[in-house]
From Swiss-Prot:
Classification via PANTHER family: E3 UBIQUITIN-PROTEIN LIGASE RING1 (PTHR46076:SF2), E3 UBIQUITIN-PROTEIN LIGASE RING1 / RING 2 FAMILY MEMBER (PTHR46076)
Designated gene of the protein: Ring1
Lineage, top ranks: Eukaryota, Metazoa, Chordata, Craniata, Vertebrata
Keywords, alphabetical: Chromatin regulator, Metal-binding, Nucleus, Phosphoprotein, Repressor, Transcription, Transcription regulation, Transferase, Ubl conjugation pathway, Zinc, Zinc-finger
Keyword Zinc-finger: yes
Modified residues (Phosphoserine): 38, 140, 187, 190, 229, 232, 248, 254
Native source species: Rattus norvegicus (Rat)
Protein name per its UniProtKB record: E3 ubiquitin-protein ligase RING1
GO biological process: anterior/posterior pattern specification; camera-type eye morphogenesis; chromatin organization; chromatin remodeling; negative regulation of DNA-templated transcription; protein ubiquitination
InterPro entries referenced in this protein's UniProt entry, alphabetically: RAWUL, RING1/RING2, RING1_RING-HC, Znf_RING, Znf_RING/FYVE/PHD, Znf_RING_CS
Region (Necessary for transcriptional repression): 30-234
GO CC annotation: nuclear body; nuclear speck; nucleus; PcG protein complex; PRC1 complex; sex chromatin; ubiquitin ligase complex
Length: 406
C-alpha cells in the first residue's frame, strides 16, 4: 500500500509552537562587535564531564558530539563501559572518537598560561592534603585544649584589682585551743594586709590582728593602741579567734583541700538595704567549698568589727588613762578623761562579737540580671557558681540584714 505524497510532506513539516510563531527573531551580528564574556561563565563548556577539569587533548564522539579529555574517555572505554558517559549512546571503540584541535586552540586562546594554571592547581591540592587530614585535625585539637588549659590556669591565678590591699581570713587548723575554723580562706580588699594565724596577745601598739578576720582585728587593735590602752591589744588578739564556721571537735579529720578558688563581688541589696545604713561593696576570693553560711558569718563579723573600730576611733582613750587628748572647743578636758590625771569613768561597752551569727545577714543572687533569689546557707559557692551564674566573670552576690534572725 502506497502512502499519498501529501501525507509524506506533512510528516516532515516542523510544527512551530505558539511562542515560536510570535517571537521576534534575533538579528545576526554582521559587524566587528565584540562581546565580553567572563571565563567563569564558560567553565561548564570547557570542562570535561569525567574529571571535572579543563579539557586537555580534546576528543569528540562522532555520534553525539560530546567532548572529553583524551585520557579520560580512553580509560572509560577500556574499563568496559562502551557508551558515552554523558548521554549513554553506543560507542564501539576509539574509532568512534575524533580529535578536536579547534577546541584546544580555543582553550589556549582563552587561557594562554595553561601551565601556570595547572601549577597553581597542584599547589592548592598539596596544601589541602597537608592541612585537611586526620593528623592535622588531631594536632589542632590538642593545641586548642592546651591553650584552653593554660588560659584557665592564668585566670585562676590572676590577682584581683587592688590585690595589694588584700587580706586573708582563715580559720586555724592547728591544735583545738589555738584557733577554730574550717580552713577556708576568704580575702577582702577593704582593709590592709594581715598575717594569717591566731595570736594569743598583741602588744600595746595594736598592729594587724592575725586572725581569721584579720582585717577587723588589726584595725581595732591599731585604733585603740594609739590611745595607750592595754586592753586594746588584748582585743586585737582576741578577735583573731573569730571563725567562719562551727568549731571543729578535737580529733576530727582536717577538711579536704579546696578544689579551686572563686572570685566574687559582695554588694548591698539595692532594694532591702537603705542608703543611710552601713553598706560597702566587697571583693572576696575564697575556696569553692565555702558555703553561703560561711559568707554570712564572715560578713557579720566584718561589719561588727568595723563598727567597733569606728566607735573606738570616735571615743579614744581607755580606763585608767591620763588626760584625754581630745579636748573640747573651750579648751576643757576630754569627754571621758579627767584633766590632771586620776582614774576616769568606765569606758562604754563596745559591740560584742559573741552574738555574731550567720543568721544576721541573708545572701541573694540575681542570675542573668533577673529577680533576686535567696541562697540556702548549706550551698557551696562552687555549686552556686555552676547552678546560677554560668558566666566567666566573678560571682556577684548581694547581702541584706535578715528581718527576723533566729
Amino acid at each position: 500500500m502506497t502512502t499519498p505524497a501529501n501525507a509524506q510532506n506533512a510528516s516532515k513539516t516542523w510544527e512551530l509552537s505558539l511562542y515560536e510563531l510570535h517571537r521576534t527573531p534575533q538579528e545576526a551580528i554582521m559587524d566587528g562587535t565584540e562581546i565580553a564574556v567572563s571565563p567563569r561563565s564558560l567553565h561548564s563548556e570547557l570542562m570535561c564531564p569525567i574529571c571535572l577539569d579543563m579539557l586537555k587533548n580534546t576528543m569528540t564522539t562522532k555520534e553525539c558530539l560530546h567532548r572529553f579529555c583524551s585520557d579520560c574517555i580512553v580509560t572509560a572505554l577500556r574499563s568496559g563501559n562502551k557508551e558515552c558517559p554523558t548521554c549513554r549512546k553506543k560507542l564501539v571503540s576509539k574509532r568512534s572518537l575524533r580529535p578536536d584541535p579547534n577546541f584546544d586552540a580555543l582553550i589556549s586562546k582563552i587561557y594562554p598560561s595553561r601551565e601556570e594554571y595547572e601549577a597553581h592547581q597542584d599547589r592548592v591540592l598539596i596544601r589541602l592534603s597537608r592541612l585537611h587530614n586526620q593528623q592535622a585535625l588531631s594536632s589542632s585539637i590538642e593545641e586548642g585544649l592546651r591553650m584552653q588549659a593554660m588560659h584557665r590556669a592564668q585566670r585562676v591565678r590572676r590577682p584581683m584589682p587592688g590585690s595589694d590591699q588584700t587580706t586573708t581570713m582563715s580559720g586555724g587548723e592547728g591544735e583545738p585551743g589555738e584557733g577554730e575554723g574550717d580552713g577556708e580562706d576568704i580575702s577582702s580588699d577593704s582593709a590592709p594586709d594581715s598575717a594569717p594565724g591566731p595570736a594569743p596577745k598583741r602588744p600595746r601598739g595594736g598592729g594587724a590582728g592575725g586572725s581569721s578576720v584579720g582585717t577587723g582585728g588589726g584595725a581595732a587593735g591599731g585604733a585603740c593602741g594609739g590611745a595607750g590602752s592595754e586592753d586594746s591589744g588584748d582585743r586585737g588578739g582576741t578577735l583573731g579567734g573569730g571563725t567562719l564556721g562551727p568549731p571543729s571537735p578535737p580529733g576530727a579529720p582536717s577538711p579536704p583541700e579546696p578544689g579551686g578558688e572563686i572570685e566574687l563581688v559582695f554588694r548591698p541589696h539595692p532594694l532591702l538595704v537603705e542608703k543611710g545604713e552601713y553598706c560597702q561593696t566587697r571583693y572576696v576570693k575564697t575556696t569553692g567549698n565555702a558555703t553561703v553560711d560561711h559568707l554570712s558569718k564572715y560578713l557579720a563579723l566584718r561589719i561588727a568589727l568595723e563598727r567597733r573600730q569606728q566607735q573606738e576611733t570616735v571615743e579614744p582613750g581607755g580606763p585608767g588613762g591620763g588626760a584625754s587628748d581630745t579636748g573640747g572647743p573651750d579648751g576643757g578636758g576630754g569627754e571621758r578623761g579627767v584633766s590632771g590625771g586620776g582614774e576616769g569613768p568606765e569606758e562604754p561597752a563596745l559591740p560584742s562579737l559573741e552574738g555574731v551569727s550567720e543568721k544576721q545577714y541573708t545572701i541573694y543572687i540575681a542570675p542573668g540580671g533577673g529577680a533576686f533569689t535567696t541562697l540556702n546557707g548549706s550551698l557551696t559557692l562552687e555549686l552556686v557558681n555552676e547552678k546560677f551564674w554560668k558566666v566567666s566573670r566573678p560571682l556577684e552576690l548581694c547581702y541584706a540584714p535578715t528581718k527576723d534572725p533566729k
